[in-house]
Amino acid sequence: MRCNGVDCHDEQRGASPPYKAAHKKIAQQVSLLHDFFICRILYLSYFYYFSRMILFMSEIILDNTMQRILVTGAGGFVGSRFVERWRNEFEILAPSHAELDITDALSVERYIIENAPQVVLHLAAISNTWYCEQHPEESHRVNVEGVCNLAAASARNGVKFIFFSSDQVYNGNCESGPLDEGVAVAPENVYGRHKLEAEQRALGLCPTAVALRATWMYDIERDGMPVHANFVLNIAKAIKEHAPLVLPVREYRGITWARDVVEFLPATFTLPGGVYNYGAECSMDTYETACCYCEMLVGLQSGPLLQPDYERYPEHERNLAMSTDKIFRASGGTVFFSTTMDGLRLFHSML
């Protein structure tokens, strides 16, 4: 076919190569973009999975890292037993008085910042109630101001604060039966008043703090760990010296094996802030409890050994017996103390 003397088919054939070149160039660019996006997707996929792997490994490492616990009073009755029981499960900081003076706010702040514990377990205290009566200023400095210094520093540094209060806060209550944490209290002795003040002020400074109202505790000397006068040792001393032991009939209180106190402490590290009764429940008076314990001892009659005291606490019965329902629920059943008598039976079976 000819158009104006020119072969139209030849013209069309001559125009084809530029279009083909353009198509080829576009195809190459599309291919490059395709390869770029594929590489990008692969890179992002690898980066995602690699990041997840790093995160997973970090979680494993963190799970296997010992939690660092600052224990005050680590050389004392409860503190030494806590360290002995949990030293392989936690990284325990047990400073001396020279390293950490709890009555010095700057010393407390500096130690916590420098050592970065996750938990402060405050067990140091003046626990002799008679001594506190005779030395109220010293008792307040240690049992109140020391607690407040630790509570404030813990709050400022995001540290969980656990500290011991006492069943002595109930020393003044006239109600019968096991007492819960919600009952109004008005302690009659210096020690109990200072413990109550420490609870109130510490929780004001550090709302996530946990105050454990501990009972009277007992144990024997083990592996050089200190021991003080307690229910079991008082009876043992009476047996050894053939000296009658006079015990009140108008007193009700829980008495707890120190082993159980120490065993449940890690479970308190995750409790919501607040006050918790902490120790064995008991429905018997102190004289009756002692008589039942003596009956466990082979061939021992409690009659000549124990004498009831009906005169002590004449105005009203001294009731320090506590209900532990709150801590049982809050811990999901993890903190579950046996009764005083069941604890004594187990303790005696393991002597």
Q: Can you say where each PLM-predicted feature lies in the sequence?
A:
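N-terminal Rossmann NAD(P)H-binding glycine-rich loop of SDR-like oxidoreductase domains
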Residues: 68-85
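Adenosine-cofactor binding site in Rossmann-like domains, unifying the SAM/SAH pocket
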Residues: 91-108
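NAD(P)H-binding glycine-rich loop region in Rossmannoid oxidoreductase-like domains
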Residues: 105-142
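NAD(P)-cofactor binding segment of oxidoreductase domains
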Residues: 134-162
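Catalytic helix-loop patch of NAD(P)-dependent Rossmann-fold dehydrogenases
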Residues: 141, 146-149, 169-212, 217-218, ...
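NAD(P)-dependent short-chain dehydrogenase/reductase
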Residues: 203-253, 260
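Mid/C-terminal beta-alpha module of Rossmann-like enzyme folds, strongest
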Residues: 264-312, 348
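Conserved C-terminal active-site "lid" loop/helix of NAD(P)H-dependent oxidoreductases
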Residues: 285-291, 306-336, 341-346, 350-351
